[in-house]
Amino acid sequence: MAEITAAMVKELRESTGAGMMDCKNALSETNGDFDKAVQLLREKGLGKAAKKADRLAAEGLVSVKVSDDFTSATVSEINSETDFVAKNDQFIALTKDTTAHIQSNSLQSVEELHSSTINGVKFEEYLKSQIATIGENLVVRRFATLKAGANGVVNGYIHTNGRVGVVIAAACDSTEVASKSRDLLRQICMHIAAMRPSYLSYEDLDMTFVENEYKALVAELEKENEERRRLKDPNKPEHKIPQFASRKQLSDAILKEAEEKIKEELKAQGKPEKIWDNIIPGKINSFIADNSQLDSKLTLMGQFYVMDDKKTVEQVIAEKEKEFGGKIKIVEFICFEVGEGLEKKTEDFAAEVAAQL
């Protein structure tokens, strides 16, 4: 069995919000596997999904460059050693110049970047000179570029603190619609920076993942219901336990069954059949909303729009399609956050945690 260290317990606790001993037991039961321990805690209703932000440790900046014709959008991340340098004007200029260089030369990898020429010298030498001037080690960690296809459009957004950047691409059915969609795409990028969706739509979700998340969702709701029953607060009724977690699970047969059940309810209520067609669509939409909580949490199209939280991003786009007179299909988005995926530095907390175990 893997050794369960105090640092492992602390990381799991910070990521899930679960209790110290619950985290230790979960790690023991899963032989030290962090992701399995998270899932186990969630299935027991003891913790929330681990957030990527909980593991961020690096300093630096994310930069975004969108071409003047909105056909190319590049996002890059350059790491520094301290937050102080990340606010340095020369470092900020370096990130912008590097991103523009990547885009104008259609570079595809960090290796290709280091071999390229900027201002008459190899980029590798240029970066070394910047390191010598700024006084800290600097690393171009990653970058990506999205290109617009025929009748396509791209845009981007960089959060004011430079720690989060987003680029997005959409396919439209005319250049006119593509041009009209520029501001919409920037606003959707702002939404992505705020809400951090992990997927574009429910269609991108893996069914096994959905099924596991459903178990965790039910456990979480049942745990909350248990507490609400104990408190007996009339202003906090029990949660309704959904049958499903995502539209990925809602087959035509399931939707048809839901529709038939709605018809039976309308008949029992004595509603005349001539008005059923006006009632059923709204009730079906409510059924879908109740049974797609995972989509509203993890998928861009299923999330409620930050600028109008009564509508999903999908609904906002549909409205804009009618306004612009054409189709708008989000093809891809990329969101970078400084330090995402890097391990935290080890601090002197092990003894403190060990004393509590």
Curated annotation (Swiss-Prot):
SUPFAM superfamilies: Elongation factor Ts (EF-Ts), dimerisation domain, UBA-like. GO terms for cellular component: cytoplasm. Keywords: Cytoplasm, Elongation factor, Protein biosynthesis. It holds the Pfam family EF_TS. InterPro entries: EF-Ts_dimer_sf, Transl_elong_EFTs/EF1B, Transl_elong_EFTs/EF1B_dimer, Transl_elong_Ts_CS, UBA-like_sf. It comes from the Bacteria. Residues 82-85 are annotated as: Involved in Mg(2+) ion dislocation from EF-Tu. Its main location: cytoplasm. Belongs to the EF-Ts family. This is Elongation factor Ts. It comes from Campylobacter jejuni subsp. jejuni serotype O:23/36 (strain 81-176).
